A protein has these predicted regions:
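TPR alpha-solenoid repeat register
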Residues: 240, 274, 308, 341-342
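Short coil turns that delineate tetratricopeptide repeat
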Residues: 235, 268-270, 303, 337-338
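Short, surface-exposed "cap/lid" segments of acyl-processing enzymes
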Residues: 7-60
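The feature captures the conserved acid-bearing segment of alpha/beta-hydrolase catalytic domains
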Residues: 135-203
Length: 366
């Protein structure tokens, strides 16, 4: 299907649509750079011009937007690669440069298919090598959507392509980048390390105003903007402050963590992740009132999230407010009666209450 925008010279062609995958080629007059963009995980919107589409087109680049409505890590792209090549052959545009671009799941797709798409350069933000890695279970729920084939093949990388990877070297993405380094040709992997930028690092770059200039510079082959600016610039990013606070907490410095989180919450007062981490920091300081208040605020900001409810149970249990913890668990069990862990934990809390009262606990089947 072909759709032209009168007055702009932009032509949109649907290359493939089906089974939750849509691929579109967007052409503009005189464009010499083609960017294959891969949508991020959780963005199931198949309409529009894809990941970063407005930005890419606004800078004069043509786009092949690869959009997936499934968290299948773009496994469904492999069978339709011939259609992409056929569409580009039919368009008969001689591009000087082909770039693959994506973040997280999209970064994985960019790395995985760059060679097959004839890309000269990859810009991958926080790409994962394999979600089956038992040491990293962040996306284990997506494994059921995969085939038995390897997610990454060692022979799937071009020695003529530069693979630029932006990531947090202090986070769980670092081992994935190391695995990419083992299969990319020597000298072709260009890591851009962004400490305390989290996953994916694009949020940090966006919050500091660096995402667009960095991506544009990488596409055009120019020098990168300064990525390690003054502390005041980094502190504009709640992601940076969260990751730095998490690092402080892991280093047993809860006071530092709490101070950093106060700064972050000044900018995002209802951010559930920030509130939850602050509750943990205040628990480390044994500030029980503050820890409980932060946990309740996190639960209110992210209603229905069992992790937030469990945090409140943990705080109440730690401060010895066992009847209050039991009341929260009763509410959780009423909302999700099939979660066996909740019933088990309720028995444990009830047993502690009974023991404190000198009463023999009663157990029942659940």
């Amino acid at each position: 299907m072909r759709n032209s925008n009168p007055g702009t010279g932009t032509v949109r062609t649907v290359v493939h649509e089906g089974d939750g995958l849509k691929i579109s080629h967007v052409r503009q007059p005189d464009a010499r750079v083609l960017v294959f963009s891969f949508t991020e995980r959780g963005n199931f919107e198949l309409a529009g011009d894809g990941f970063g589409g407005d930005f890419l087109l606004g800078n004069g680049f043509d786009v092949v937007a690869i959009k997936s409505a499934r968290s299948s890590w773009f496994e469904e792209v492999a069978p339709v690669l011939p259609r992409i090549h056929a569409a580009l052959d039919q368009a008969a545009v001689r591009y000087d440069l082909r770039v693959c671009y994506g973040s997280s799941m999209g970064g994985h797709g960019a790395m995985r298919y760059a060679a097959a798409l004839g890309a000269n350069r990859v810009i991958a933000i926080s790409p994962l090598f394999d979600i089956r890695d038992p040491a990293d279970t962040r996306y284990a729920e997506d494994i059921r959507l995969l085939t038995s084939d390897p997610m990454i093949r060692a022979d799937g990388f071009s020695p003529d392509c530069d693979y630029v990877v932006l990531y947090d070297p202090r986070g769980p993405d670092a081992p994935h980048v190391a695995r990419f380094g083992a299969v990319v040709a020597p000298g072709r992997l260009r890591p851009v390390r962004l400490p305390y930028s989290g996953h994916p690092s694009g949020y940090f770059l966006a919050q500091t105003g660096l995402l667009k200039p960095v991506v544009e510079a990488l596409i055009r082959g120019g020098a990168l903007p300064k990525l390690r600016g003054p502390a005041v610039a980094r502190r504009r990013s709640s992601v940076y402050l969260y990751c730095l606070a998490d690092g402080c907490l892991r280093a047993n410095k809860p006071g530092w963590a709490a101070a950093l989180l106060d700064t972050a919450l000044d900018r995002a007062p209802r951010d559930a992740e920030l509130l939850a981490l602050k509750s943990r920091a205040l628990t480390g300081l044994r500030d029980w009132d503050g820890a409980e208040a932060a946990a309740r605020a996190a639960m209110a900001a992210d209603a229905g999230n069992g992790h937030r409810q469990m945090l409140l149970v943990d705080v109440l249990t730690a401060r010895g407010a066992l009847p209050a913890a039991l009341a929260v668990l009763d509410k959780m069990i009423g909302e999700a009666p099939g979660v066996g862990h909740y019933a088990w934990l309720r028995q444990e809390v009830a047993a502690r209450i009974s023991a404190a009262a000198g009463v023999q606990p009663q157990y029942w089947a659940t």
